[in-house]
């Protein structure tokens, strides 16, 4: 597997790793290896007894990870939603000192036209995080009903012209050759959008929505968060970077819910043992951070990012 030459600047790099409160002999998980920015910084802070396990479902990321020659480091090819399974298989559940998740699409994925994520560069209409599995965006759009496309654009892109765009996509696929290129789709969306926002391409929300749907991103994140909390040691840290409001709302809600104890409706007689069986709070929120103005100026893609850090409650 060859790698591309597109560079990637990790957003909130120091802040996300600092949020893990690295112990030199600790065990850490980088659930989204990408191009290894966070992993390399974590390794630089680990001692000889420390261990870092990275996960990524992108074959290009795996190729980059395989170039790291360090006995403390290992890479797993697969979705981060399976984090609990991977760590259970390694016999490390409850022993992990920190999990880092950097959500969304990496710069190399966006910048490589062959991956089909960007409306700014023409390429195959793919959008899969792992191009070796699942259906591409083009395949889905070719067979999807207008109502299904409308729902995806509204739900995952908050696109106000979702119905117009969906109608245009279905009409195009029925009357002409199906959409197979990113530029074809971007141009179609532009034509179908009656109002253009300043400083934002008309296809921005639709491309985001289709990408999230094709990769089941929000479901993957929810499973990854649940798995991450389950494998953390007492006082272990969870450090999560999100890049748009849908991701951040999900992360915020998850940390909030995991910070509460069981809610017992008034008037229901339960013994202390029964209340304990309902479970207890597992996380405490540490802090929320956004990038500095300097970082946003140097890396505009950092603009909408949010870092949230939480800690596993010691039982």
Swiss-Prot record:
Gene Ontology MF term list: rRNA (cytosine-N4-)-methyltransferase activity
Gene3D superfamilies according to UniProt: Putative methyltransferase TM0872, insert domain, Vaccinia Virus protein VP39
UniProt KW keywords: Cytoplasm, Methyltransferase, rRNA processing, S-adenosyl-L-methionine, Transferase
Residues reported to bind S-adenosyl-L-methionine: 36-38, 56, 80, 102, 109
Main localization (coarse): cytoplasm
EC nos: 2.1.1.199
Top-rank taxon: Bacteria
Swiss-Prot/TrEMBL GO biological process terms: rRNA base methylation
Subcellular location(s) of the protein: Cytoplasm
Catalytic activity, reaction form: cytidine(1402) in 16S rRNA + S-adenosyl-L-methionine = N(4)-methylcytidine(1402) in 16S rRNA + S-adenosyl-L-homocysteine + H(+)
Coiled-coil zones: none
Disulfide bonds: none
GO cellular component: cytoplasm
Top class in the EC scheme: transferase
HAMAP family per the UniProt record, alphabetical: 16SrRNA_methyltr_H
Family statement drawn from the similarity comment of this UniProt entry: Belongs to the methyltransferase superfamily. RsmH family.
Function: Specifically methylates the N4 position of cytidine in position 1402 (C1402) of 16S rRNA.
Protein name listed in UniProt: Ribosomal RNA small subunit methyltransferase H
Species in which this protein is naturally found: Proteus mirabilis (strain HI4320)
Upper taxonomic lineage: Bacteria, Pseudomonadati, Pseudomonadota, Gammaproteobacteria, Enterobacterales
Annotated gene: rsmH
């Amino acid at each position: 597997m060859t790698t591309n030459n597109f560079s990637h600047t990790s957003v909130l790099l120091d802040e996300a790793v600092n949020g893990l409160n690295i112990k030199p002999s600790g065990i850490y998980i980088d659930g989204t290896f990408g191009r290894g920015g966070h992993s390399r910084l974590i390794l630089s802070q680990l001692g000889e007894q420390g261990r870092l396990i990275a996960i990524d479902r992108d074959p290009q990321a795996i190729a980059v990870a395989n170039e790291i020659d360090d006995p403390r480091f290992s890479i797993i090819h697969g979705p981060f939603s399976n984090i609990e399974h991977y760590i259970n298989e390694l016999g490390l559940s409850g022993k992990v000192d920190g999990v880092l998740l950097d959500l969304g699409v990496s710069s190399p994925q966006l910048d490589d036209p062959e991956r089909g994520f960007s409306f700014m560069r023409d390429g195959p209409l793919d959008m899969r995080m792992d191009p070796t599995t699942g259906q591409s965006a083009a395949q889905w759009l070719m067979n999807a009903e207008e109502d299904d496309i409308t729902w995806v654009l509204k739900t995952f892109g908050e696109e106000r012209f979702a119905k117009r765009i969906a109608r245009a996509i279905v009409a195009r696929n029925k009357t002409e050759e199906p959409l197979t290129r990113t530029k074809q789709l971007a141009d179609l969306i532009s034509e179908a959008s009656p109002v253009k926002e300043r400083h934002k391409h008309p296809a921005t929300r639709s491309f985001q929505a289709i990408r999230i749907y094709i990769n089941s991103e929000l479901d993957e994140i929810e499973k990854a968060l649940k798995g991450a909390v389950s494998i953390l040691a007492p006082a272990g840290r969870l450090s999560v970077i999100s890049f748009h409001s849908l991701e951040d709302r999900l992360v915020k809600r998850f940390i909030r819910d995991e910070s509460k104890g069981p809610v017992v409706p008034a008037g229901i007689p339960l013994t202390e043992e029964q209340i304990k069986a309902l479970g207890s709070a597992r996380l405490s929120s540490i802090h929320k951070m956004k990038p500095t103005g300097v970082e946003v100026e140097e890396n505009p893609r950092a603009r909408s990012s949010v870092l949230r850090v939480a800690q596993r409650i010691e039982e």
